[in-house]
Amino acid sequence: MSRIGKHPVPVPAGVTVTVAGQNLTAKGKLGQLSLSLIDDIAVSMEDGKVVVQPRTETKRARQNWATARTLVFNLVKGVNDGFTKNLEINGVGYKAAVQGKDLVLNLGYSHEIRYPIPEGITIKCDKPTSVSVSGTDKQQVGQVAAEIRAFRGPEPYKGKGVKYENEVIIRKEGKKK
């Protein structure tokens, strides 16, 4: 029995979840998201909760049980609260700004980097050294944050680059004379 999959997903007030076969649709104050699950997983609504169960006792069904439950949980949480990833920029002259539908990054290259902001994602720069990526889809928020970080990841000697807010960079000592 899956320790995660056996727990039903509570649906908060203000969120409606529609189950149609293997497709789920959640509507909330932040928008609408849909999810399609594999055939080995059965989904149903019971007492205002989404219950996820394996259809068969095959290995594949058991492997995907908790995964499907977590995807449903993220779907419900996304339309109700949303997800946010914060990035920090360290380095002399390194900065970020939002111009129209682009995120403009100056990261020590000879040119500035223009990153087009995808649909469904909101990017804010409260300070030139902090970037906040938010949206309803957890996977898309994480992917956009990872793409921004990949432009110049943190280096281990001085810590310059783009890093996640709570990320710990293991520092190295420079060469000795």
Swiss-Prot record:
GO process annotations (BP): cytoplasmic translation
S-S bonds: none
Domain of life: Bacteria
Cellular component terms per the entry's GO annotation: cytosolic large ribosomal subunit
GO-annotated molecular function: rRNA binding; structural constituent of ribosome
SUPFAM superfamilies on file: Ribosomal protein L6
Keywords assigned: Ribonucleoprotein, Ribosomal protein, RNA-binding, rRNA-binding
Keyword Ion transport among UniProt keywords: no
Family assignment from sequence similarity: Belongs to the universal ribosomal protein uL6 family.
UniProt subunit comment: Part of the 50S ribosomal subunit.
Protein name per its UniProtKB record: Large ribosomal subunit protein uL6
Source organism phylogeny: Bacteria, Pseudomonadati, Pseudomonadota, Alphaproteobacteria, Rhodospirillales
Gene (name only): rplF
